[in-house]
């Protein structure tokens, strides 16, 4: 459907999102407390549009005399660099004053996720012993720069981001997390996870429901394509927010060493999705039909938190219990005591000692 007018665009886009939020209707709200949902904001089109649509919904509830909102929204922005963009977050706070806001850098994961220090040390091996004399930014940089490929860095960044979002959501006593992933984003994420050996965890990364982290994951934008959201944002969002599409590395040179699997598949899905939207939509719909095994298990990956498949597709320990032909052997003989899924074990092979990393 083409969003060819402001009214039509808002009705079309907003109704699909609101429908996905039906479980949080006022009629279903607990009577003894106010529900709170965390919304990670990247300043991109998808998460910004999600905030805009839900803000409109809550404003309508307030003006209709319901007595209270169905839920509160806590907006979280995670900066990827040392210098935070507090001015930009202030623009969103001014445009949508109903909500509370928090901004933290990625390296604050050492503060909010109390187990990550030991996890990184175990995952990295003896070369990655934690140095308390270094700042959190330096500790994170050493670990990230020790990943020798763009795909490995993007993979670990995504895991750390999820862990930090979950940790803050629990600190804020949130009932769930509202991810702003569009259908386009979910399709590319599913394909890249399969390519990286994380196919077993795809249902938890793409589908609504209880996550292995013990908190609800919701994807209200899952029925909208990226190009639809771009049109909606250009019509509906306040111009002062200056929301623009995030730029990815050029794919003109497919051998570009700075290009990750995520970048390549995101470009493929976005370009092909405009030509064949039904095909890309079927990726997410098919995954949504999968029935993941119970996340309530003691066998979880120590890094990504996903349940480990003991049927043979995932090695429980590198070179250990995994009986599959795909079990990985780390030629550096760096044993790990914790449990790793196949995807994290494979990414671990791209780690190099810090002394070999050139800044």
UniProtKB/Swiss-Prot annotation:
Q: List where in the cell it is found.
A: Cytoplasm
Pathway assignment reads: tRNA modification; 5-methoxycarbonylmethyl-2-thiouridine-tRNA biosynthesis
Q: Which Pfam families match?
A: CTU2
Instruction: Please provide, in alphabetical order, the Gene Ontology terms of the cellular component aspect for this entry.
Output: cytosol
The UniProt keyword set, sorted, is:
Cytoplasm, tRNA processing
Task: Tell me the GO BP annotations in alphabetical order.
Answer: protein urmylation; tRNA thio-modification; tRNA wobble position uridine thiolation; tRNA wobble uridine modification
Q: Which Gene3D superfamilies match?
A: HUPs (3.40.50.620)
**Any GO molecular function:** tRNA binding
Function text: Plays a central role in 2-thiolation of mcm(5)S(2)U at tRNA wobble positions of tRNA(Lys), tRNA(Glu) and tRNA(Gln). May act by forming a heterodimer with NCS6 that ligates sulfur from thiocarboxylated URM1 onto the uridine of tRNAs at wobble position. Prior mcm(5) tRNA modification by the elongator complex is required for 2-thiolation. May also be involved in protein urmylation.
What HAMAP family does the annotation carry? CTU2
Regarding protein family, the annotation reads:
Belongs to the CTU2/NCS2 family.
Q: What's the protein here called?
A: Cytoplasmic tRNA 2-thiolation protein 2
Native species? Ajellomyces capsulatus (strain NAm1 / WU24) (Darling's disease fungus)
Q: What is the lineage of its organism?
A: Eukaryota, Fungi, Dikarya, Ascomycota, Pezizomycotina
Encoding gene, per UniProt annotation:
NCS2
